[in-house]
A protein has these predicted regions:
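ATP-binding N-terminal substructure of ATP-dependent carboxylate-amine bond-forming enzymes
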Residues: 1-65, 72, 94
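Active-site nucleotide/adenylate-binding loops and adjacent lid/helix of ATP-dependent enzymes
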Residues: 64-118
């Protein structure tokens, strides 16, 4: 039985789990599934429950949850040796000020972009 949590891609059984963790009915449906389709906006709790219940889960979100956010993407690209823009990661503004206290000696020259990790 193909179980779909995707709002557009239909399966034999269709469930929506948007904005919430999987409930007992979702988990029971997963236990009966031979394959599970997940939505793009998948919570980690839904993904982990699907992986525990079924060997065939699409898509594979392992990298997404192992390397969350923008800083996670940079770390993943570095580990895999993939090209990416030069990136510096700071845990907060105090970390930046500690590492670069002199405003005349910034680590990067313009043009540059500052992003929050979310």
């Amino acid at each position: 039985m193909l179980l779909s949590f995707h709002p557009i891609l239909e399966g034999d059984v269709n469930r929506l789990c948007a904005g919430r963790d999987p409930d007992p009915e979702d988990l029971a449906a997963m236990d009966k599934a031979t394959a599970i389709l997940l939505p793009q906006g998948c919570r980690e709790s839904l993904y982990r429950a699907a992986r525990r219940a079924c060997a065939r889960v699409f898509p594979n979100y392992e990298a997404r949850f192992a390397y969350p956010g923008k800083t996670g993407q940079v770390k993943l690209f570095r580990e895999l040796g993939l090209p990416h823009p030069e990136s510096l990661i700071f845990s907060n503004i105090e970390d930046f000020n500690t590492r670069y206290p002199d405003p005349d000696k910034m680590p990067l020259a313009p043009p540059l972009m500052v992003k929050r990790d979310w």
